Amino acid sequence: MSAFYVTSFLLALTLAAGLSDREKLKKFLAFLYLAVLWTALSAIWQRLTGVAANSSQTDLAANAGMPGRVYSTFENPNNYAEFLVLLLPLAFAYTTMLQNRRARLGATCLLALPLAALLMTYSRSGWVSFALAVLVLLFFCQRRMLPLLLLAALLALPLLPGSVFRRILTIGSTSDSSNLYRVYIWQGTLRLLRQFGLTGVGFGPENFHPV
């Protein structure tokens, strides 16, 4: 596990050193943009062909009627949602770098595909994280648009699919076992901080779980 973190750190350093000008950054963002689109197409194909609801990932009693959650090329819908939340802002940044207006408009419209995929992951944490990312982006780039965005979000709520709206309502619900499991994890983390705050317990879940 430690090798994974070291490799990730070295990769980050390599990217920081390699992306030395705007053109290199644009090519890198183009690659990320295509990766986001590819996974979105895979997720949409999963929805069209059918993906079974997994009781190990969703409390089916608290989320009755919710279809299976897409995960694209990932094994877990929450992990896929994390991927989208991290890369969608970068994919959007790529569209703003396109000089041709038609190309920029087309590339921006295609981002509707990964947005739809994010909805179909039914990842509540992913939805909340993406909403916060949009708010931060607008705050620094188009602060005057924030009131309009909030109004549009409120008006869009009745237009959401019923399963999505019901999923939103379960955020913070104590009747959802997955929420209770998170509370259990947080409590365990606080105990770990009290007992091993200075030394830690090592990398990875294989060290976290037994402690």
Predicted regions and their residues:
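Alpha-helical transmembrane segments of multi-pass inner-membrane proteins
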Residues: 3-14, 26-67, 72-140, 147-160
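Aromatic-rich transmembrane-lumenal/periplasmic boundary elements in polytopic membrane proteins
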Residues: 41-56, 163-180, 195
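A glycine-rich, aromatic-flanked flexible loop/lid motif
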Residues: 158-163, 204-208
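Short, hydrophobic secondary-structure boundary micro-motifs
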Residues: 57, 94, 148, 167, ...
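Long extracytoplasmic/lumenal interhelical loops at the membrane interface
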Residues: 53, 172-187, 191, 195, ...
